Amino acid sequence: MKAIAITHAATDGSNIAYLQEIDLPTPVAKGHDLLVEVKAISVNPVDTKVREGFSADTPRVLGWDAVGVVKSVGESVTLFTPGDEVWYAGALGRAGSNSEFQLVDERIVALKPQSLDNASAAALPLTAITAWEMLFDRLGVAENGNEGDVLLIVGAAGGVGSILTQLASKLTKMTVIGTASRPESQKWVREAG
């Protein structure tokens, strides 16, 4: 299978010269793994951070947020079957989604919402998970609750901020205030809630 891997450290964080197309054997699903044919990915800040800190002797396939179709399943898989369209934020310790196929543990995968195209769905997993956990798990906000409270979101038009803005304005009774620097970002934040 074809994959894009980093071959050397990219010390300035933006240097893509060390991203190279490589050929790898197609992995085999075992245990709780799904073999997913990758259809769309997004570039996450984690990709840049891993590129900056890369120091291994062998190439590393990056990429975490992805959408794809399950091609085969390991013997312990119970949640998915071949043909399922899925989305996920992969695991740091495994080969990434910048490849034709990826092994992903079924326990960190969900069915892709049918209302989203592949590119839109691939842009959501890690940002959406982070925003949800921040609002409901870390801050302890109750769904449909917290009336009278105010939530200030700095960077409300960014990746996590944009999801957090929508979750807070649609799923809680809080007053949501968001900051954004550019006029087009300010307009988007106002329209999002």
List PLM regions with ranges.
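A structural motif shared across PLP-dependent enzymes of the aminotransferase-like
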Residues: 93-106
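Mid-domain Rossmann-like dinucleotide-binding core that forms the NAD(H)/NADP(H) cofactor-binding site
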Residues: 122-193
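Glycine/charged-rich beta-loop-alpha catalytic/anionic-binding loops adjacent to active sites
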Residues: 108-118, 146-149
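Eukaryotic N-terminal low-complexity, Ser/Thr- and Lys/Arg-rich leader segments
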Residues: 1-2
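Residue-level preference for short coil/turn positions at secondary-structure junctions
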Residues: 30, 81-82, 105, 147, ...
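Short N-terminal binding/cap micro-motifs at the start of the first secondary-structure element
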Residues: 10-21, 31, 45-46
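Glycine-rich beta-strand-centered segment in the early N-terminal region that forms part
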Residues: 25-42, 51-93
